[in-house]
Amino acid sequence: FNIPLHSAEFEINFINVFDESSISEVIQELKYENNIKDIKIFLDKKKWIERYEIKRNFFKPSSINIFSRKPIFIWNNNSFVDKEFVIFQKSENSTFDSILSINCPRSLLDDIFYFVQNPIETSENSLVSIDYNSVEGWVFQYEQFQAKLGKNLDNYKFENLSKTMEYLYAKRKNPSIVDLRSNAGVALKYDK
């Protein structure tokens, strides 16, 4: 959105901001603020703000342009992560349709970040969520099937998953589970 709002002596423009509660918080905080230094300190503390521009005008109201970070996935249902691996809080009211959801411990987030930037998808199967649990390891949920990759992620598993997806698409096969946890090969499970 691009929402011009006026506070004290400033017009505030929110550009590509997707979270209305974040907008409200900024408006409430800056409503009566005139001090540029205090405004900068406040805006610098907000991790969801990628950058901002403050333009001083002498004959009309000054303006603040606030640009939001664009999340590439939701982490553990309470945080967003952007393309620069900046983690910022997700408010309860945030609505972000069709964004990847990842649930894993912080210590494993680095492992999955590379894959998220270069996902393996086909036109018929896009990635919906990635979960890690101590029993099965990494589980990738696609629109039409689930891929179990095990506890250790490496290029071999991603290549194997990519080739398996290409094969399944070419042969018009629709398994419910693609299991890549074994070094012996790929196991497919079809629902009856």
Predicted regions and their residues:
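Charged, solvent-exposed interaction patches on well-folded alpha/beta domains
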Residues: 1-192
